[in-house]
Amino acid sequence: MITLHILVSILLATPTIVLAENPFDGFLQELRKEAINQGIRPTTLDSVLKGLVVNPKVLALYRRQPEKKQDLSSYLKQRVSTTRITLGQKLLAEHQPLLEQVASEFGVQSRFIVALWGSESSYGRNMGDFSVVRSLATLAHGSKRKDYFRRELLVALHILDQGHIHPSKMLGSWAGAMGQCQFMPWSYDRRAIDFDQDGRRDIWFTQADVFASIANYLAAVGWKNDQTWGREVTLPPNFNSEFTNKKMALQEWQNYGVRRLNGTALPTRKIEAKLIRPTNANGRSFLVYDNYDVLLKWNRSHHFAIAIGTLADRLRPSSVLLLKNQ
C-alpha cells in the first residue's frame, strides 16, 4: 500500500503529457496560411496539400548526394554519348521548322537548345516521376536548405493555381526540377514561355513551349547568337600558368602558342576568350567565350557547361563540325 501511495503521488505531481502534433502537418498548416496570404486559392491548396506526407525516398536521395566529383572525361563519356548524339541529330532535323522559328525569335542557335534538352531530360524521355509539390514540401521541412525549398514550393503552388499543369502531372526530379527542361519553379516563373499561345506554359508536354523556354532562359541571361561557347585547345610546353582564367583576344592567345586541339591555328575572328583549366579535368584546357558564362548561369558546373558545348558541336553535320570563324 505504501508503494502504491508513493506511485500515485508521483503520477499526480508529474505534468500532464500531451502528444505533439505531427511536425510535418504543422508545417503544412503554416505553409497554407502563407500561401493564402500570397493570393493562392484555398481550393487549390486543399486539393494539393490534403493528405500530403513526407517522401522518405527524397530525403534519402538528398542525404546521399555524392561528395566526390566525377572527372571530366568520365562525365563527358556519360553526357555526350554516341546514343545521345545520334538521337539529338535525328530530333534536331525532325523539329527543324519549329526550332528555326524559336531560334529566330530568341536569338539562340537550335543546336544549343537541343543540347540542353538532351542533357536535362534525355530529350523529354526522362523528366522524373516525383511529385514536385511533395518533393519540395519534404525538402522545405527536412533539409538544410529549408528557406530555399520553401520559396520554390510556394512558386510551385502559384503555378498550379494559375492552371498551367494539373497537380497529378506536375512531375520532376527528386529535388523539384520540372519538365523537359528541368526548371525549378522559380526559373519556370521567370523564364517559361507559352509559345503556342494556348494560355499555359507547358514545359512537360508541349514541345514549342519547351524549346522557347530554354531559348528564353539563355537569351535573358546574355546569350550571344553570333558566338559559340568555346573549344578545347592545346598549350605549348612550359606555358605560363598565370594566364589561366585570363581573358584576351584570340590573336593574343595565338601569339602565346595556344592552338586548336588538332594543332591548327585559332580562328582569326576579333573576339576575346578566357582560358580555363577546370579541376578534375585531367589537365585539359579550354578557350571559352561569353556564352560559356551564360551556360554557367544555367548550371554552375564547368563539367556541365563543357558537356553542353561539346554536345551542341556534335549535333552539327560533320562537314561543318569545326567553325572556322568562331
PLM region descriptions:
Residues 35, 46-54, 107-124, 156-159, ...:
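Short, functionally critical alpha-helical segments immediately adjacent to catalytic or ligand/cofactor-binding
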